Amino acid sequence: MTRRWTMGPEWIAILALVALFVVGTVLPINMGALAYVAAWLVGMYSLGLDEKEILAGISADLVLTLIGVTYLFAIARQNGTVDLIVRTAVASVGGRVALIPWVMFAVTAVITAIGAASPAACAIIGPIALGFAGRYGISPLMMGMFVVHGAQAGGFSPISIYGTITNSVMEDAGLGASHLTIFFSSLAVNTVMAAILFVVLGGRKLMRLRMDADGELVEAGAATGSATAAGGSETRVHPDRSDARSATGATPTTGTPNPGDAGTRLEHTLTLLAFLAVAVVALVFEKNIGFAAITAAVVLSILTPKAYKDTVKQIAWPTVLLVAGVSTYATILTTAGSPEFVGNWAAGLGAAAIGALILCYVGGVVSAFASSTALLPVIIPIAIPLVAEGGLSAGFFVAALAVSSTIVDVSPFSTNGALMLANKPDTIDENTYYKQILGYATIVTLVGPLLVWVALVLPGW
């Protein structure tokens, strides 16, 4: 008698994920809305969950972070405070435009390395970095991804959140911690990816540009005649910003506005103090950055209610829906056992190296839609058979898993990628920027785990 094969819930959840991704890419429908539909149907009719259990999967933390941060920065953009930060930061690099992305990368890396959550660091630095991109003609994709890669570059230090989780899980599994191996692996991979982005997305051109005393872009060029004796010449550059406003509030035709163009000195001071308070509350006292940001925004609105009465409309509501829906469906995936199903299958393969590669891809693909923090404790124990029986180095294998599961946080469906999308410069259309981030995230998800595996696992360190 032939045994009849039935499709398990783990397969149904995986196929539904593929379907909603395809539909959301082909049709102009918010993928968060599609994810809610998929979560409802798969949850009720495949997993037998009721609606309360399905709704319990929504990541309220991520949603509140997006709402609070975009609300606060909408106020800062409206009163000119972000523009003030931009001018100050430009001055700190001596007007050398090419250094701006690397400064943002380094600052974000330091913040996560000393213990900040990756989304918290991206929430604080991302809008400021994208303000630079909108003002000075830097690729928004490069700038946004520099912030995310910076967060991951420092994200596995021994005292960081990711580093603490990863090494603790290794010790609990009897593998022994590999603090420096994991940290420097993540630092190296993300720095290399940032360097590639810098070259591909116009970084070499930025090296010829600087800001003059009036805040305008100038390009150094070879001098002739009497200018040669003076040591060179400069050509003023005019980026095409005729149809958009920058994220910092400058109009395309006015360049860098004067400090008094928007808001007052008191408003700027109060807003800067609000930024500082949010950073201290979130990073030092380890409170939720979403609550901190929305509280700061409400306090500023109470102090000047008429000025900010319409600011709430500038919250990135489409992005909020995107993250809320996808995070809910990610819980359905986990409940269905899809990650464990694929991971256990990979661990059961005969070749340890091939099993390791498959696990790296499982980590990358799942983390592109779900929480990296939640995934790491799940996927690392699955790798134990490959370490015990396959002769793989525990430190480098776990490093490969950790890096593969976090470099994909550039995805617009993850918190970090969504924060970049939510704070896009006004010089780029939201749909265009979404497609750029999605395209880059797709490349990273498809190629990144393979390259990480080749560098860290295949040599058999």
At which residue positions do the language-model features occur?
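Membrane-core helix-loop-helix motifs of multi-pass transport proteins
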Residues: 132-220, 418-455
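C-terminal transmembrane helix pair
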Residues: 178-195, 354-357, 365-380, 384-461
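Transmembrane alpha-helix interface/packing and boundary motifs in multi-pass membrane proteins
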Residues: 20-29, 107-117, 148-156, 281-285, ...
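Hydrophobic alpha-helical transmembrane segments
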Residues: 10-15, 33-36, 98-106, 120-124, ...
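Membrane-embedded alpha-helical segments and adjacent helix-loop junctions characteristic
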Residues: 49-135, 312-389, 397
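Transmembrane helix boundary and interhelical junction motifs in multipass membrane proteins
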Residues: 32-33, 116-129, 143, 157-163, ...
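Structural signature of hydrophobic alpha-helical transmembrane segments
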Residues: 4-13, 59-71, 119-122, 166, ...
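Hydrophobic transmembrane alpha-helices of multi-pass small-molecule transporters
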Residues: 1-65, 73, 199-334, 338, ...
